[in-house]
Regions:
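A short, N-terminal "cap"/entry segment at the start of jelly-roll beta-barrel domains
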Residues: 1-31, 44, 110-118
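Ligand-binding loop in jelly-roll beta-barrel domains
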Residues: 83-108
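Structural motif
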Residues: 61-63, 70, 86, 96
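Glycine- and acidic-residue-biased ligand/ion/polar-headgroup-sensing regions
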Residues: 50-52, 56-62
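Short strand-connecting beta-turns/loops that link adjacent beta-strands
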Residues: 28-30, 50, 94-95
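Conserved short histidine dyad/triad with adjacent acidic residue
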Residues: 33-48
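Histidine-centered metal-chelating micro-motifs
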Residues: 42-44, 63, 79, 83-88
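Short acidic-glycine-tyrosine-enriched beta hairpin
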Residues: 69-83
Length: 118
């Protein structure tokens, strides 16, 4: 793949029952998705054992718990954190919230750990 241009606004999609995730791209080394939240929707607390993560807020305000710290991230801001850090994403506002996240593909991390390289 040479390159890919994604119109994040055109890819937005919402559902009343749960947040909607859409894959932007997934390569051998990197992946990215957008997640769209109606007011009151959230992603449960979780962690990624090997992957660092960066979350960019495209629209509205995302409230996150990151390693037991509440963080408010407004549109146009990005937050990143190391692997194995518990985190969640919540839309506590009255408007729709859209985030984009970016992570290293866990398969490449496993290959590096196993000595197979990229």
């Amino acid at each position: 793949m040479k390159h890919q241009v994604s119109d994040l606004h055109a890819l937005k999609d919402f559902a009343l029952d749960k947040r909607v995730r859409k894959m932007l791209f997934k390569t051998d080394q990197l992946w990215s998705e957008i997640a769209c939240y109606e007011p009151g929707q959230s992603t449960v607390m979780h962690s990624h054992p090997r992957e660092e993560e960066a979350i960019y807020v495209l629209e509205s305000i995302a409230t996150m718990s990151i390693a037991d710290e509440n963080v408010t991230v407004p549109a146009g801001s990005i937050v990143n954190f190391p692997a194995n850090v518990p985190h969640d994403v919540r839309n506590l506002g009255s408007e729709r919230c859209v985030i984009m996240f970016l992570k290293v593909n866990p398969k490449i991390l496993k290959a590096d750990r196993d000595g197979k390289g990229a």
